[in-house]
From Swiss-Prot:
The keyword RNA-binding does not apply. Residues 462-516 are annotated as: Disordered. Disulfide bonds join 42-68, 221-238, 344-350, 372-381. The gene is rhgB. Glycans are attached at residues 145, 239, 321. It comes from the Eukaryota. GO terms for molecular function: polygalacturonase activity; rhamnogalacturonan alpha-L-rhamnopyranosyl-(1->4)-alpha-D-galactopyranosyluronide lyase activity. This is Probable rhamnogalacturonase B. Residues 1-21 form the signal peptide. Residues 469-485 have a biased composition (Polar residues). The lineage of its organism: Eukaryota, Fungi, Dikarya, Ascomycota, Pezizomycotina.
Amino acid sequence: MRLHAFTLLSLLGLVPSFAAASLSGSVGPLTSASAKAAKKTCNVLDYGAKADKKTDLGPPLAAAFAACKSGGLVYIPAGNYAMSTWVKLANGKAWALQIDGVIYRTGTDGGNMIMIEHTSDFELYSSTSSGAMQGLGYELHAANNWSGPRLLRLWDVSDFSVHDLILVDSPSFHFSIDTCSNGEVYNMAIRGGNHGGLDGVDVWSTNIWIHDVEVTNKDECVTVKSPAKNILVENIYCNLSGGCGMGSLGADTDISDITYKNIYTWNSNQMMMIKSNGGSGTVSNVVLENFIGHGNAYSLDIDSYWSSMSAVSGDGVELSNITIKNWKGTEANGAQRGPIKIICPDKVPCYNILIEDFAMWTETGSKQWYSCQSAYGSGFCLKSGSHHTSYAVTTTTVSSAPSGYSAAKMPLDLSTDFGSTQSIPIPTIPTSFYPGATPYSALMSKQSTKAAKARAVDMSVETPAAASRSEQVVQGASQETSQPAPESAGPVRSVPTGGNRPSRHRHGHHHFWIAA
């Protein structure tokens, strides 16, 4: 019998019901990267790659994958690599891709620089937490070319993780998770240009856990698209970004059981937006909890008549069972754009919308408004009642700050954007993504350092022969070229004190994480 962590923990009363409903089962690869590497390691340098920032990495990467696709680890050592032809790595099983170098886009085709498809039991990571894809999108954007490639796309991938990776300046979207299942994405930094169409993370999949990710761009931060079910998004740092959202939503929308938790949004377009214009289908069972915002144009923005998208045939997307809880901070100008805007379709009004513990205040002026249309539930401008008929926009204006709106800021909040026509530097992955929240997993670079130190301590009590072998292992793990450090990889990482976590696969078995 297959058990799931959330089912067990919720029965024990250890996980809130909304969290238990977010994911439907375990996430992550079935086997560790170290086990994959032990079976076979395919170093791209052995297949013709050169870290000279000139030789095309595409063919060597494809060749290394072909050799390891049935089980093994494809290894890109530290160094600078050029990539002018894109790769589609399909039909792999029980394999991992370790990117410790920096891949620079040198080609101009559209599509996806790296696409993983029809794959199971997969892990993509950097053991140094500094591996990156540098899209150099500014080179195309300066010529008003916005049709360049995406950096990374996963399609039809199950039981996977992507972590400790940096994505920079994509010509188009940065990271798309398309029709995947049982996945985990974490410890990432994404930095794009200040222009629309340069999405951070887009996900339309089932049973996905995205956490501890920083995004800088002008469009989507971490956005759920249709169809999607059982998505948990938490500890997200939208650092001068477009902000998180759902949509754009069109015909036959099918989104349910979505949780956004611990979302920090700085100087962005919105804290959360659900956007549509016509269409059909449903969005249901959504929790938006623990949001902090500062300097954003919009805060909560549900707009079923969003004018920036062309109208879609249909009466509108039905929104129901949405909880907005514990929002704090400030918006840029509450008189121009109030912190609560819930505009629902007149033909299919929203219902069971709950707003509680919501305290935002304007940074400019001394008043703000709340606006609702055809929206039912509890809190602020929402109407109560079980008969959900349409009604015109109602707006409430207030001129005094709510109590408890003050909220912490992050020390790495950016003061300026990176434009879209100049080079964007490769950042480091932060170690904090939401005020007061400890990331679920330490960066792999820090884990490797701790492992090496522990190994060095153990050497002092080993026999001389064993100590010699241990020293060789430590030295090999610290090298940045020629050999991977598989002992630092794998689906099992440290558990922070004081919180519950979803279940990850552990060496082919389901492991139930219970916080100390």
